[in-house]
């Protein structure tokens, strides 16, 4: 199906031609697009402890960054930008915008960052290590891509940038820009987290002991016996592909440190919706909800996968699949909420 969001390309065509290959500019990708929030709303978010924010001020060729939360914040008349990350965690409209990109795996979706800039505002030329969609809100912004292409973005325009493309956006008037970012964990980051995960589940834990220790001729030299012991201990660490999949599911769904869920009451009517802070993924017979791994009876699995994919489903359908008790527990934890049909 052709998507106006992608300039008339199908999702398959976009992924083949542009994804992680070359930029795409779509004028009017979101017709009649209106800002998700106003400057006062964004300033209010930037004052909160559970929200990541920063202000960038351009001073000549320098860009000075301050990090929130900000007790008192007032926009300067020019060369000033406020950026707030994870707006989708706090604003329903931002979460809806993020879900428009569901033709990509949820495991890759990260967040919506909203920025408000006054005349001349920007963060300077830079390169991102991840894919990003830039959606222009009110006002206009001039983008220079790779130092060669200039794009004048107006409300509803979309720019896709693959990793490594140098870009620089400057506000031509007070404006909003919304960035859809994607998760791209580094190998070293995954490796360190995986070793922690293995350790929590129990690793061989024998303690080093000296065997036939002799007086040290060079007291600062590391004994060969200690090197041999460390090599043997590390060599005993074993894991399977199933272990990796389980770790990854828990890792990818783990809420960010600042996320707090509001406990609710169990309701058996209406439509069940995943809270916008919740992440429900699956792999094979295993499901992962907000950092926890679990399984369900085979007769329930297809229904739960559908809830994960669509993020909403009738409470009655979930109950018929034998998931009523699980959904009630999630309502009490604040992971899901019930809405009127």
Model-derived regions, located:
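Short acidic (Asp/Glu) and glycine-rich catalytic loops that position anionic groups and cofactors
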Residues: 22-23, 171-174, 203-214, 284
């Amino acid at each position: 199906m052709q998507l106006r969001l992608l300039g008339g390309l199908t999702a398959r065509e976009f992924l083949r031609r542009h994804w992680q290959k070359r930029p795409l500019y779509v004028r009017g990708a979101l017709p009649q697009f209106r800002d998700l929030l106003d400057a006062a709303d964004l300033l209010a978010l930037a004052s909160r402890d559970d929200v990541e924010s920063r202000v960038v001020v351009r001073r000549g060729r320098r860009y000075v960054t301050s990090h929130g939360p900000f007790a008192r914040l007032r926009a300067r008349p020019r060369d000033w930008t406020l950026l707030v990350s994870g707006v989708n965690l706090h604003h329903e409209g931002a979460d809806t915008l993020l879900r428009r990109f569901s033709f990509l795996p949820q495991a890759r979706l990260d967040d919506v960052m909203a920025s408000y800039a006054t005349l001349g505002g920007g963060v300077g030329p830079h390169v991102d290590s991840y894919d990003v969609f830039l959606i222009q809100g009110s006002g206009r912004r001039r983008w220079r891509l790779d130092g060669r292409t200039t794009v004048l973005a107006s409300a509803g325009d979309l720019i896709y940038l693959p990793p490594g493309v140098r870009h620089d956006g400057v506000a031509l008037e007070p404006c909003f820009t919304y960035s859809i970012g994607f998760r791209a964990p580094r190998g070293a980051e995954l490796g360190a987290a995986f070793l922690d995960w293995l350790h929590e589940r129990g690793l061989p834990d024998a303690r080093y002991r000296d065997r036939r220790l002799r007086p040290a001729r060079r007291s600062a030299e590391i004994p060969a016996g200690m090197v041999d012991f460390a090599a043997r201990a590390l060599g005993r660490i074993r894991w399977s592909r199933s272990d990796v999949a389980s770790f990854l599911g828990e890792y990818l769904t783990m809420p960010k440190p600042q996320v707090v869920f509001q406990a609710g009451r169990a309701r058996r009517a209406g439509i069940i919706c995943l809270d916008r802070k919740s992440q429900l993924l699956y792999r094979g017979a295993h499901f992962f909800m907000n950092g926890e791994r679990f399984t369900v009876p085979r007769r329930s699995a297809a229904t739960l996968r559908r809830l994960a994919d669509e993020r909403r489903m009738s409470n009655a359908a979930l109950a018929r699949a034998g998931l009523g008790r699980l959904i009630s527990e999630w309502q009490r934890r604040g992971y899901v909420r019930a809405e009127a049909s």
